[in-house]
Amino acid sequence: ILDALDRAIAAGTAGNIAESGRLVSEADASLRGESGLGTLIDNIALVSGLVSRVDQLDVLASGAEAQLESESGLSTREVERRSNELIALRDATWSLRNDRLRTAKAVGELAGKDASASARNAYLSIQQAFSALDRMEVRGRDSAGVHVLVWGHGLDATDKRVAPLLAGRLDDTLFTNGSVRVGAGSRAWSFVYKAAAEIGELGDNTRAMRTTVSN
């Protein structure tokens, strides 16, 4: 992945923005989903290398954009082609920084240290839901909630190590934030997380829910 980004930087430096964007897009695609999360999580060296290269690519794209704006005598078709190449490069680098790296960091914070791969994958689904809620909030929502269904966990609600963690959460008739329901035979459990920051900043609701989930 880092090699692909190094080649993307070299291509962009040589003026081949299209090739640079293609290579960054391929690197971004390789880090999507559960397999990408497994590659990034707790891999400090890789994450540091990615951040450094994405920073370089952003500078490269800004320089190419400034050069395009300063050039005169270009045909409309040429301007359009080069603009589209820059957009593709910027989109790919933005996705690496704000989708892949940000998601891996958020999942790590939700799941905690030493979480299993299956647990991290489950938290990835929760993080994806939170990201969707963040986008919805921009459109004016002032409350949000997530209902999480977990099965195949092998836990027993009556276990003396588990029961204290469920105290006060099983009998909430209003199903408020933090409530839990245990299905027949303890096979499936449902957890609810809710927040309503009617007066506040964008992201307040998901920040509150992330704190509840991680605790």
Give names to the regions the model predicted:
Residues 1-215:
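N-terminal segments that mediate ammonia production and transfer
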